Every structure is written in C-alpha cells, then in structure tokens.
Amino acid sequence: MTTTIFEPGGFRYMPAVSQYSGGVAAQPGLRIERARFSRVVPLAEGFERIAQHLASLGRPNSAFCACELRSPAPFTEEGFRAFNAIYITTLERWGLMQGGVNPVARSNVCPDIDPPAQPGFHAFSYTVVDAAAAPYFIVAGSAESPEGKGDYRDNAIAFGDVSPAGLRRKAQFVLAEMERRMQALGFDWSSTTATQVYSVHDIHPFLADELVRRGAMRHGLSWHYNRPPIQHLEYEMDCRGVSTEIVLPG
C-alpha cells in the first residue's frame, strides 16, 4: 500500500474510505501535535475551536490531519453514512478533500457510560513546522470489519461472538490492521508512543499474547470503555507516535 502526500497540510496519508484515511505521517520539516479537549466539544463548535487553535499557531486549516470523535451511541449503517456526510462538509470547505479522497485520519467511538449528548471532538492532531522533527504518525481507528467492502456488519470478524475466543479473533484482525497501516506509513510498534483500545468486553484473556508480546503495549495501554461506532462491532484500536500532546479547555 502506497501513501499520498497532502502538500497543503504537510503530511502524507494512507488512502482508505471517504470518511477518513488509514493514517497520516508528517512530512520532513514538520511534526504532529495532538490536542485533547478536557470534555467532548460538539462537532460544529469543535471545528471552530480547531480552526482558532490552528490560527493561533500560524497554521492553515489544511494542517488538521487527524481527530478522535465521541458519539452518543453506535450508529446503524445508514446513520453512520448520514453522519459522515455531515462531517466531511467541513473538510470540503477547508480544502482537505481531494477528488472525494479524505486525507484526515479519524477514530469515532461511543462511551458506554456517560456518553455525550451529540457527536463531538475528544482530540485532534495537526502538523507544525519543526526543522529538527523526528518522524511522527497517527493510525486511524479500526474495528473488526474490513473497510470498503460494504456493510460493516456483513463483513465483521466473528460476528456476534463475544466469547474469549471470539474477542481474540477480533483483536487479532484489528492488530494486524494496525500493523498493515503502520507499515504503509513506514513505522511499526517500536515507533509508537500510545496505543488505545475501545471495548466494553474483558480483554485480559488475550492481552499478554496478542498485545504485549507483539510490542503493542511498550508504553502501556489506554483502555476506553467505549464501543465502536457501528452497531454489533465490539473491538476497536488506534495508535500513534507523537512527541507533543496538550490539553485544551472543554
């Protein structure tokens, strides 16, 4: 899998589906920073806050390269498509979409307890100029269903099976997808600074064998008691390698 350079933003990306890319990496002379809101900020307000933050750094909106969303509950397939259509309108207005191809990486998950009232931003990432920067990257979220093959439900790994064996199969698929995306960007687990898991199920039975032994937890693990964004999916991950992370007021 090859990557494509998005010159206006100073990053390259792994093409995936219309709603997001498979991952991004900073171009030479730039680095990726991650900013997390102290609480979820609703989508429209969040885009405004992101634009203000980028402007304060002297960066264009096109420097926006990744985000982590939170939604009230898992979507139906049709509901997910409708949400994505709303989400990408701002990306189109910002000049981020290239012929229908989306360069921005994204995770979108649903807190099972105390969810937000509406979809919004948990965190976002962007490029900044840094002549001495080491390579930095972000891999988009993936659940246990291949992208671009029709309905997620119809292609889900071990559909409906939340037994230890079923969850292990789901995790194996997602971990392999993380590795495939990192490899396309020129990275591996040794390059990560953070790994995140989103599931409401017990991951301990396969944690050591599937995550620790392959190096996915070299800096520990952030486990969010969240569900993937589509109904009937059970396990999602993303990962990143960045040097600067900040927290902004919600």
Language-model segments: which ranges?
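Beta-strand segments within the central parallel beta-sheet cores of soluble alpha/beta enzyme folds
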Residues: S190-Y198
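Short, well-ordered alpha-helical segments
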Residues: G46-L54, G58-S62, C67-S71, T76-I86, ...
